[in-house]
Amino acid sequence: VRRTNNEWQTPKAVHNDGWVINGCPVNGPKAAVSSKNIAVGWFTVFKGDPQINVSFSKSDGESFDTPIKINDYNAIGRVDIEFLNDDEIIISYMEYDDNGTYLKIKKVSDNGDISEPITISKIDGGRSTGVPQLEIINAEIFLVWTVFENGLNQLKSVKLNSISI
């Protein structure tokens, strides 16, 4: 939903995936704003294929570009996004393959360019990990997630220089 001229506009879908879930999804969308773009990242299941998508708006949310599929393997979701600059985001997400579940990040530009994934950590795919959180502060990328070790929930974190991504 957008607010223009002090009035709320009629809500519009970022993209109509056609996904229906009977219950409360763990995966909600995440949005980020730069001085010229809005980006939304979300988990969906499209024709039986779990996906993580990103879509950019260059019109202050009036319309969104065709979604860009992010995941390479089986998506779990748990998405977070932040803008690196006006044209590029970092997206964090979880996906799994035959060897386990992983927390990964990618850089995505509003022109559709996608970086190779960076694996941050092997991670438990269950709900106990929560939703990993991503922030960019002074050109440094911070990721924090929950792990269950030694009978306790603990936080793990990593700091990356955004210039090296």
Predicted regions and their residues:
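Extracellular, repeat-based ectodomains that mediate carbohydrate processing or recognition
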Residues: 1-165
